[in-house]
Amino acid sequence: MSIDLVFVAPDDPLADGMVDAMQEAGIRAFGPNANAAIIEASKVFSKNLMKKYGIPTAKYEVFNDAQKAIDYIKNENTAPVVVKADGLALGKGVIIAQSVDEAIEAVKEIMEDKKFGDSGNNIVIEEFLTGPEVSVLAFTDGKCVKPMVSSKRPQACF
């Protein structure tokens, strides 16, 4: 018995290059390679990509220094605000802070206490947007794009 095709879905193996490794070993694999998976694996990369190509996204700032992030929060004095660990954090790396104090605490937890390990070396602080969150995904081979059915994440996840 041999392996015909491997579907790689979890974020960590995709970001770590599992599809690349399978293909190098001659095993057909379905999923993005590591270069494409960075869109999901790095909030900083994805936000900067959206900005570069004019894709609408929430106003944001990126920080690699906790004190600079805290100073920004104090100067902006806006809540609620969203604090995101840059890297993968098993779906737990997004904190919706309802107050300035909560936002400062989120920065400390992520960057100083290393709540999400190295995934919190950089953070994104972005404006809080209201409304439904919808995911739109598509299959592509680099030439042709086939959209999937859109989905809506229940707000209770946050």
Placement of each model-derived feature along the sequence:
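Active-site charged/polar residues at nucleotide-handling catalytic sites that mediate phosphoryl
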Residues: 1, 76
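A short, GP-enriched loop/loop-strand-helix hinge that lies immediately N-terminal to
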Residues: 4-42, 54-64
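Short, well-ordered alpha-helical microsegments
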Residues: 14-16, 69, 133-134
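Short, acidic/turn-prone active-site loops that include or flank metal/cofactor-
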Residues: 33-38, 109, 152-154
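Conserved ATP-binding module of the ATP-grasp superfamily
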Residues: 56-59, 78-82, 97-135, 139, ...
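Short acidic-glycine loop/turn motifs at beta-strand connectors
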Residues: 140-144
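ATP-dependent carboxylate/phosphate-activation module, predominantly the ATP-grasp catalytic core
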Residues: 145-158
